[in-house]
Amino acid sequence: MPVPKRHPARQKYRLLELTRIAKKLNLPINKQPKFFPPKDPHLPAKFVIASNKMGNKLSFGNECLKYLWSLEKDISDFNILEEICEKLSLNFEEIKKIALNDEIKKEYQQNSEDAIKNDVFGAPSYVFNNEIFWGQDRLDYLEEALKK
């Protein structure tokens, strides 16, 4: 359910959790960023997939989160995506070409279908050995599962 449609108590708790997370991780977070949710959440997601294909496993996605939650930038804007590429010394035109091609569209669609098949209901979610781990506060459980 989109954040604005959640029960007011749930919305209030979400803001409290964001404060806790920011403090625990020492991250600057704008709890109500101007551009959340992004106008087009699919575009930055496709750029993340493209950057992964180019060998940037986490940096592009991490920068997108920083730009959205800390810098209050619209990550569905090509100019902002280009700014992120420049910061990471990535070729924007190359990533853009990859992000907008049919292969990435198919992979993005497959990721969505896989999420539905695995009963993913929110982000962040991780599926390992057919078991779902939901929420940043469950990463320790995922870590334990990975060690087995």
PLM segments and residue spans:
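C-terminal cap of thioredoxin/glutaredoxin-like
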Residues: 63-148
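Structural alpha/beta surface segment adjacent to cysteine/selenocysteine redox centers
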Residues: 1-68
